[in-house]
């Protein structure tokens, strides 16, 4: 299975100048990596998710590279146009050059009170426009401490089950247009990291739940996110249940981001 390493830039960098500087560093690092291994991009797909305001410019810079471009969210109100101040629709995001979007990140769930119903509408809008979905799930510190991780994940994955019920004509797109990112909320940006064994067991559970939804979902890509960095990437990449990483802070430094991508690329040999 091809690995995926996705950089979620969140509300960074601050200026267009800084965005271009990061892209310069990233493209230079990618070029060096390809010189070391021509098959690198085939083994590990790299993708970055900039802010909406930088989406078109980043896509323009990356269109002749193997790096894909994703949005960080889509409107839950309309897939195309409408009187929804501040929203960006899936159609607009595709027009800007993105081929994927992140949905359900814990920061969106926390700061914008995104519910399963909201995320279902966003998923429908995205996939109806052939915009792939990186669907984020994960438990809080309190839920982890009280051993509710699997219960929480099952509840969050219910969005996908309901999507299949409501949109049977789109089921065929899911194996190639849906990625799950398991991100324990307590590990995001904190430096706290679950053990590889814990992540592996959780990923196995996620894959089993998805396979139970539909036969076509028996081999889904599941990424890990939460304080992934250049120092621990090899450990996560070595586990066959972990198909890649959703990277936050480390994706804002080209060298560390490419070190993570190289770890998963080499593990896919």
From Swiss-Prot:
Pathway: Carbohydrate biosynthesis; gluconeogenesis; Carbohydrate degradation; glycolysis; D-glyceraldehyde 3-phosphate from glycerone phosphate: step 1/1. Pfam families: TIM. Its EC number is 5.3.1.1. The keyword Cytoplasm applies. Substrate binds at residues 8-10, 189, 227, 248-249. One of its GO terms (cellular component) is cytosol. GO terms for molecular function: triose-phosphate isomerase activity. The active site is at 105 (electrophile), 183 (proton acceptor). GO terms for biological process: gluconeogenesis; glyceraldehyde-3-phosphate biosynthetic process; glycerol catabolic process; glycolytic process. Keywords: Cytoplasm, Gluconeogenesis, Glycolysis, Isomerase. Disulfide bonds: none annotated. Homodimer. Involved in the gluconeogenesis. Catalyzes stereospecifically the conversion of dihydroxyacetone phosphate (DHAP) to D-glyceraldehyde-3-phosphate (G3P). Belongs to the triosephosphate isomerase family. This is Triosephosphate isomerase. It comes from Psychrobacter cryohalolentis (strain ATCC BAA-1226 / DSM 17306 / VKM B-2378 / K5).
């Amino acid at each position: 299975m091809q690995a995926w390493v996705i950089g979620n830039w969140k509300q960074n960098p601050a200026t267009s100048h800084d965005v271009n500087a990061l892209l310069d560093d990233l493209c230079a690092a990618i070029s060096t990596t390809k010189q070391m291994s021509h098959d690198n991009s085939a083994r590990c797909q790299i993708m970055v998710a900039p802010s909406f305001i930088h989406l078109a410019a980043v896509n323009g810079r990356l269109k002749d590279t193997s790096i894909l471009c994703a949005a960080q969210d889509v409107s839950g109100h309309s897939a195309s146009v409408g009187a929804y101040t501040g929203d960006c629709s899936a159609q607009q995001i595709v027009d800007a050059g993105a081929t994927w979007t992140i949905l359900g990140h814990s920061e969106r769930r926390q700061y914008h009170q995104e519910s399963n119903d909201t995320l279902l509408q966003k998923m429908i809008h995205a996939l109806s426009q052939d915009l792939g979905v990186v669907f984020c799930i994960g438990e809080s510190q309190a839920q982890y401490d009280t051993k509710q991780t699997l219960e929480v994940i099952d509840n969050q994955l219910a969005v996908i089950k309901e999507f299949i019920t409501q949109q049977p004509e789109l089921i065929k797109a899911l194996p190639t247009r849906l990625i799950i990112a398991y991100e324990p909320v307590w590990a995001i940006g904190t430096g706290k990291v679950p053990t590889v064994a814990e992540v592996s067991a959780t990923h196995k559970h996620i894959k089993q739940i998805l396979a139970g939804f539909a036969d076509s979902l028996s081999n889904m890509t599941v990424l890990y996110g939460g304080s992934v960095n250049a120092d621990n990437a090899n450990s996560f990449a070595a586990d066959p249940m972990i198909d890649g990483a959703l990277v936050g802070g480390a994706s804002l430094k080209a060298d560390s981001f490419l070190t993570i991508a190289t770890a998963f690329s080499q593990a896919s040999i």
